[in-house]
């Protein structure tokens, strides 16, 4: 009898599987003692042409907890530079590619699992995901989506009834399995593995596949390879700028954790800045601070340079150098534009020198003021008044802190004067647009570590999921929300 599960009747495409056995290994999903759907991302279903009202929790569990009705399930092969050291012993260690489906927008999407059991690349691990790890990924990806950052999403999170032991969580801890919704799971490290085995033919095959599938606007262009790398550079620079403006620290920017389409994924010990600290390091095991917040743009550029090694098997050095040459300018332009939006302005409204001066002054203030990074922008959103344009004295410091003695006077006055200066450069008719921009760019609450714990503790102690759902709903509806499609030029 044909399945009535809408996930099992989707028109799956064997895009990655068609590359052949050199790129992946067929695996079996783990079986779990229990299945309880804890999160379902109904906002993604219309992209697949599905009506959330017709998709039941049991449909999610059957497809994404029991993994029935799909084969082959593919553990993808890749290598990578981990903390600067090449590691050839990598691959999908606790997940697999469940399937690929073309959305109504024409884009191909991956369903990729996390916590679905052992694979040939588990390296002695159990292949499982803690429930807290799953909740953390939901929080990170949904908040970044709310900010307009390009990111993979969590489609479902199912608690699976096992006790897991971890060194970085109080144990035993609860288990889960997640299905991610990403544009692709092809990484920089997917190419690096092929270079390791000296397979220029497979580099060529994979590059053709990536261009045809994710950069199809370049098909037929005699300079498609060079333009692909230049565009990947732009996308990666944009992504780094988005993270920095968001105050987001990915924590583990190894080459196997960077997507070939410039999308955030592989969330591990991520963190959002509480206070602004350029040297903040999110991962407890990053003892040298290699992947600290301020290093993220440079690490992204370095990883693009490392990608030149496998791509250099089929591309000229001149094309690769030309492609990466614009990284710095692209990053700075995107970062400036995004920071100005968080301050309520559009870059094309302002003289660049004045705008850049405001950004620098803002960061100098945040270094010393007793206020959180995202908290500052949320309070600016709440306190901004159109009267600030005509009356400098109306811009009072008490919205930053009531402890005015703790506020560095020189930094505060410098910021206030520059913000007022930008307001006077705009016509009065633009003031309502500033308020709208502040609301769209600055959610009222960010998932800094205390907020994450305030959501997790009720789950851990009382199995109370209401605080998580309340926070997610707040992001969905706060400031008119963000679109569920990712707006990136040429992101086909």
UniProtKB/Swiss-Prot annotation:
The keyword Ligase appears for this protein: no
Signal peptide: none
Single annotated GO MF: ATP binding
Keywords, comma-separated and alphabetical: ATP-binding, Magnesium, Manganese, Metal-binding, Nucleotide-binding, Nucleotidyltransferase, Transferase
InterPro entries: SelO
Enzyme class per UniProt: transferase
Binding locations of Mg(2+): 257, 266
Necessary cofactors: Mg(2+); Mn(2+)
Reaction(s) catalysed (UniProt annotation): L-seryl-[protein] + ATP = 3-O-(5'-adenylyl)-L-seryl-[protein] + diphosphate; L-threonyl-[protein] + ATP = 3-O-(5'-adenylyl)-L-threonyl-[protein] + diphosphate; L-tyrosyl-[protein] + ATP = O-(5'-adenylyl)-L-tyrosyl-[protein] + diphosphate; L-histidyl-[protein] + UTP = N(tele)-(5'-uridylyl)-L-histidyl-[protein] + diphosphate
EC number(s) per entry: 2.7.7.-, 2.7.7.108
Residues that bind ATP: 91, 93-94, 114, 126-127, 180, 187, 266
Keyword Membrane: no
Active-site residue numbers: 256 (proton acceptor)
Family: Belongs to the SELO family.
Function: Nucleotidyltransferase involved in the post-translational modification of proteins. It can catalyze the addition of adenosine monophosphate (AMP) or uridine monophosphate (UMP) to a protein, resulting in modifications known as AMPylation and UMPylation.
Listed name of the protein: Protein nucleotidyltransferase YdiU
Organism: Synechococcus elongatus (strain ATCC 33912 / PCC 7942 / FACHB-805)
High-level lineage: Bacteria, Bacillati, Cyanobacteriota, Cyanophyceae, Synechococcales
């Amino acid at each position: 009898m044909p399945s009535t599960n809408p996930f099992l009747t989707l028109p799956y495409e064997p895009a990655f599987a068609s590359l052949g056995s050199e790129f992946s290994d067929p695996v079996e999903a783990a079986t779990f003692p229990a299945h309880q759907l804890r999160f379902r991302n109904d906002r993604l279903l219309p992209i697949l042409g599905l009506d959330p009202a017709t998709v039941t929790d049991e449909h999610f569990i059957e497809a994404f907890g029991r993994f029935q009705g799909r084969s082959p399930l593919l553990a993808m092969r890749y290598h990578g530079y981990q903390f600067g050291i090449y590691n050839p012993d990598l691959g999908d260690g606790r997940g697999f590619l469940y399937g690929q489906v073309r959305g109504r927008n024409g884009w191909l999407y991956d369903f990729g699992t996390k916590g679905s059991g052992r694979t040939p690349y588990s390296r002695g691990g159990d292949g499982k995901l803690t429930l807290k790890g799953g909740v953390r990924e939901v929080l990170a990806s949904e908040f970044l989506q709310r900010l307009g950052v390009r990111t993979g999403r969590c489609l479902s999170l199912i608690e699976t009834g096992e006790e897991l032991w971890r060194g970085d969580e109080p144990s035993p801890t609860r288990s889960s399995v997640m299905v991610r919704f990403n544009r692709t799971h092809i990484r920089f490290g997917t190419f690096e593995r092929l270079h390791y085995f000296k397979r220029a033919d497979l580099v060529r095959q994979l590059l053709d596949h990536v261009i045809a599938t994710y950069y199809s606007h370049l098909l037929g262009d005699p300079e498609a390879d060079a333009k692909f790398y230049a565009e990947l550079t732009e996308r990666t620079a944009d992504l780094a700028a988005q993270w920095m403006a968001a105050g987001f620290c990915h924590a583990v920017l190894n080459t196997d954790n960077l997507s070939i389409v410039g999308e955030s994924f592989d969330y591990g010990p991520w963190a959002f800045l509480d206070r602004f600290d350029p040297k903040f390091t999110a991962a407890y095991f990053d003892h040298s601070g290699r992947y600290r917040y301020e290093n993220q743009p440079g690490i992204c550029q370095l990883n693009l340079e490392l990608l030149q090694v496998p791509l250099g098997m089929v591309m000229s050095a001149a094309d690769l150098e030309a492609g990466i040459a614009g990284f710095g300018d692209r990053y700075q332009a995107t970062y400036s534009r995004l920071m100005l939006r968080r301050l309520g302005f559009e870059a094309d409204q302002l003289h660049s020198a004045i705008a850049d001066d405001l950004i620098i002054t803002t960061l100098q203030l945040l270094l010393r003021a007793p206020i959180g990074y995202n908290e500052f922008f949320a309070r600016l959103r709440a306190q901004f008044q159109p009267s600030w344009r005509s009356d400098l004295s109306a811009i009072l410091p008490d919205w930053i802190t009531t402890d005015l003695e703790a506020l560095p006077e020189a930094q505060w006055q410098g910021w206030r004067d520059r913000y007022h200066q930008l307001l006077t450069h705009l016509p009065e008719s633009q003031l309502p647009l500033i308020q709208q921009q502040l609301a769209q760019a600055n959610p009222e609450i960010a998932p800094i570590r205390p907020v994450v714990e305030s959501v997790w503790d009720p789950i851990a102690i009382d199995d109370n999921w209401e605080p998580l759902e309340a926070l997610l709903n707040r992001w969905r509806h706060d400031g008119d929300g963000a679109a569920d499609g990712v707006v990136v030029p040429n992101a086909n």
